[in-house]
Amino acid sequence: MWFENKVTSNKEAFLQKVRLICAKLGIEPDWLMFVMNSESGLNPAAYNPNGGASGLIQFMPDTAKGLGTTTEALRKMSNVAQLDYVYKYFYPYRGKMNSLYDLYLVTFFPAALGKPDSYVLQTSTLPAKVIADANPGIDLDHDDRITVGEFKRWIDLKKKSMGLETGFDVFVIAGSFICAGIILWYILKRDNDD
């Protein structure tokens, strides 16, 4: 599993629970580990003073309240206990998160889930420029707005910088994860062995 070597406490229990909640959500554990590593370095006590985001997936204060807790309480939880709230956060989106991009969009800007690459991240009360100014590393085009496509490119750049370029994509088909690269390898090997 990606980044499992970065888990510093309760490692076996944490990884087992990650696998369990991912199975319930129908997502790849690597995807969730990527998001948690990117957002918090897998630190359940991580805190961003700009806005008060806290925890493994950087819960915002209003989000934590909606989940029946507070960011302060989340920061005091163990990594294993906090996974209950990670699961609770993603649960309404189960069946709709079919890629790492989808999972990360739900984490960062849930309204963008399922939108085309041209969709601009903004709301009637939160202008695109405010979102871009708060996240300059994601505004790759430096045009004071972030599109879904730009967000996906940012994820790809993060993956590449972390050495996670695998040369094949993971597709979700009928609830099963099939690695296209492995299938291609098998077909090529079989054909060459004949």
Which sequence ranges carry the predicted segments?
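Catalytic glycan-binding domains that act on GlcNAc-containing polysaccharides
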Residues: 1-141, 148, 152
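Short acidic DE-rich linear segments
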Residues: 1-2, 190-194
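Prokaryotic Sec-type signal peptides and long signal-anchor helices
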Residues: 18, 63, 155, 172-175, ...
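Short, aromatic-rich amphipathic segments at membrane interfaces
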Residues: 153-167
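Single-pass alpha-helical membrane anchors
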Residues: 166-192
